[in-house]
Amino acid sequence: MLRDRRKACLKQVKKVIYASIYLNLKAITMTQQYPTDDIKIREVKELLPPIAHLYELPISEEAAGLVHRTRHEIADLVHGKDNRLLVIIGPCSIHDPKAALEYAERLLVLRKKYEKELLIVMRVYFEKPRTTVGWKGLINDPHLDGTFDINYGLRQARSLLLTLNNMGMPASTEFLDMITPQYYADLISWGAIGARTTESQVHRELASGLSCPVGFKNGTDGNLKIAIDAIGAASHPHHFLSVTKAGHSAIVHTGGNPDCHVILRGGKEPNYSTEHVKSAAEQLIKAGLSPKLMVDCSHANSRKDYRRQMEVAQDVAAQLENGEDNIMGVMVESHLVEGRQDKPEVYGQSITDACIGWDTTEEMLALLAAANRKRVAP
């Protein structure tokens, strides 16, 4: 007991010392003739540590059970132990939690309806990687007004994920950095590493430590090798810098993630055809990896036309009916209202990439369920 008190006391003393050193360094820097630190930084704000949100919004037993089961089910799909089709479907990005919950309520009905053929997981993306500039997502700018209330954005993201899981809808998301997973990764059943970050060393290291299965997209130019290399890298242990739940800088040592797979999202040309799928599976086998892969119905595979997602789904369905067993999943961008808008004026419509509407969503899921039913029929 005394030893613990001494440790706590020493920790507090160190904090005071470090704070004093920092203030002294700041004062010195401000009076330097040639300042070299934080020259282009306008402001630094304190971020609430992950533990603050985890304490306020703790995971429930129901949510934990759903996440645990869904992760194992997806891992079984990746390793060929389950013959259902994983469907990652939902808005391109979340900007309105109310609309997201209405979408989830509708999707939950279809999740139960097709549970024997499809494993439906809602796409719940809070962060948007940008080629240049633009709205970066609910976490970065939750009020959509350029105030960048990130503390509120992180809380809103966790609150939505908790509600979704409590109602029985598992969630998926894209991971963009090394810090935000500490705030809500316990509520995620499947994660994605995007085409712009698959080749990044830190994202491969991050994936090696995530508790959920992870999909790596091929590069924006269609390069599949970088995704295959990423899977191999993520399966091994790594050390990298991140933060603890208490918000302190830390060295993270991972154990490696054996449940990663490729996502074919197209490049200069679409890559979802029978020939592309077979070629990708052969390359995965040659690399000593599972040949199971996912097809992204959007992005370059749809030639950035949301209406063509149905064409991709129809092609995938035909492959399933013909016995193609290496397609373990699809990804679809879908919302309550089809299309997109620049400002959030239409309820249930995307403000980032255009999505298919709800009627098409129902039609597509029925198509995929029927195709997979035929694929697994004796």
Where are these predicted regions, by residue range?
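N- or domain-start disorder-to-order transition segments that initiate the globular core
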Residues: 41-78
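Internal helix-turn-beta structural module
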Residues: 333-374
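Glycine-rich anion/phosphate-binding loops
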Residues: 94-112, 147-159, 314
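Conserved phosphate/anionic-ligand binding catalytic regions in large, soluble enzymes, centered on
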Residues: 86-96, 353
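Active-site-facing alpha/beta catalytic cores
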Residues: 31-37, 117-272, 276-277, 299-300, ...
